[in-house]
Amino acid sequence: MAARRRRSTGGGRARALNESKRVNNGNTAPEDSSPAKKTRRCQRQESKKMPVAGGKANKDRTEDKQDGMPGRSWASKRVSESVKALLLKGKAPVDPECTAKVGKAHVYCEGNDVYDVMLNQTNLQFNNNKYYLIQLLEDDAQRNFSVWMRWGRVGKMGQHSLVACSGNLNKAKEIFQKKFLDKTKNNWEDREKFEKVPGKYDMLQMDYATNTQDEEETKKEESLKSPLKPESQLDLRVQELIKLICNVQAMEEMMMEMKYNTKKAPLGKLTVAQIKAGYQSLKKIEDCIRAGQHGRALMEACNEFYTRIPHDFGLRTPPLIRTQKELSEKIQLLEALGDIEIAIKLVKTELQSPEHPLDQHYRNLHCALRPLDHESYEFKVISQYLQSTHAPTHSDYTMTLLDLFEVEKDGEKEAFREDLHNRMLLWHGSRMSNWVGILSHGLRIAPPEAPITGYMFGKGIYFADMSSKSANYCFASRLKNTGLLLLSEVALGQCNELLEANPKAEGLLQGKHSTKGLGKMAPSSAHFVTLNGSTVPLGPASDTGILNPDGYTLNYNEYIVYNPNQVRMRYLLKVQFNFLQLW
């Protein structure tokens, strides 16, 4: 299991309570979704339409309609799946679909004001999941201005319009600001106090101080051309580890698997405030689920969440979030986004630095990682711990320990509660995209705005004494079969033992220091050993005789602490997952 100062049980992130009962949708009243009217103040230079399934594609009347159900006359077809690189000049890239201006213009900026905005709107009742992009562009060669607009269903190219304004900046601003007002009912100059208006678009808050992946690739290409490119001073095993956890492309692929739309809100660009707003929406969804409100209130809460955190469901209707499990999955998504925000900022390279980029990334972690020899005592004990606590119910894969790193996080040793007894070396697992955040910031507790019912024993740092329980939270696959597991020294002190999940477990401590969820199987104390002052609960697991007379019994133990100072990261394992053949 793993834990982060904010993550889930048994090793990954948020853990959902067991729930088998799904609830039906309630009926909701329709919203007025009449398309906005449009005026032109400048000459239209170019207005290209995407092919539509029947009927004439009139921009002024279809820009708010093409997002609906598949098969309607105004549903746009996707004509290309080609990936286009972003060319970044200034603080925001020109939309790659604006072929007339890519490489020839840049997004206009005035100080910290970037005339680039992505709007989003989701309405489950009408199967709306749409975006509206507006950019004010300035030509590179001369002071000619234009306004680029593109709109459609999330994940689709949609329709677009390019309005030329020659050298008249004021007219270009007027068009940009009016379109923003039309779509949001907010004034552009007051966007710092933006308020979502029902039936209108929301504004995605972007961080323009963060480099995009494409800018980083450009920097890497430039650095490779330098004849003075320094060699890395890191051990080769550490170099490979840093490459693994700082792989932005892999992060993007992982987020796409979770249905997050990386084109509308590129990784590293979504602000902390936007992610926090996503948590607040999930809290509303949690309130609806707990109150049994499965009609209009739940639908509006889901609309708000998908509007704030863009998802790509293709032409399918965005699903209602109706169960604790579905809520937990969205909490995991936001936690991953938060970690990726940290990672994107950390991997920004300094071209003029005397260090190799990998050395820069490693230094920015503020976390020492020392490879251990495979013949060392620590390696042998931990390898035995890994294999002997592989749970019998997790039989679809085996694990091979590739490398072991001793971890020394800046400040953790000094802050650690050594005064507490009952210190154990316990497991925590997490997605590959989360490790930069974990190693640079430590294991963290979920933020206050996160729903509490997404966590089995409340908002704490979760650990396991069974390796595979935590390994499941690595979400490895046959194609991506490398994962990382963390072993932390956890000062458990006196445990409050529970037979079943309770999201309010922290409030039940009554002077105790941690929560322990009791499982049916666990390592026997007869096999325990001590490593550097911590108890290592070696397996194999045996029947504990634990039975919950009132309901479901946990399969394996859960350990939860609610204070990061009770955790000290000690070892990081690089593991290969060997999945069994299906036939």
Swiss-Prot record:
Chain's gene name: PARP2
Keyword DNA repair: yes
WGR domain: residues covered: 104-201
Molecular function as annotated in GO: chromatin binding; damaged DNA binding; NAD DNA ADP-ribosyltransferase activity; NAD+ poly-ADP-ribosyltransferase activity; NAD+-protein mono-ADP-ribosyltransferase activity; NAD+-protein-aspartate ADP-ribosyltransferase activity; NAD+-protein-glutamate ADP-ribosyltransferase activity; NAD+-protein-serine ADP-ribosyltransferase activity
Phenotype when changing Q159A: Decreased poly [ADP-ribose] polymerase activity
Official protein name in the record: Poly [ADP-ribose] polymerase 2
Activity control mechanisms: ADP-ribosyltransferase activity is regulated via an allosteric activation mechanism. In absence of activation signal, PARP2 is autoinhibited by the PARP alpha-helical domain (also named HD region), which prevents effective NAD(+)-binding. Activity is highly stimulated by signals, which unfold the PARP alpha-helical domain, relieving autoinhibition. Poly-ADP-ribosyltransferase activity is tightly regulated and PARP2 is removed from damaged chromatin following initial poly-ADP-ribosylation of chromatin to avoid prolonged residence (trapping) that has cytotoxic consequences.
Effect of V154A: Abolished formation of a complex with core nucleosome and HPF1, leading to abolished ability to catalyze serine ADP-ribosylation of histones
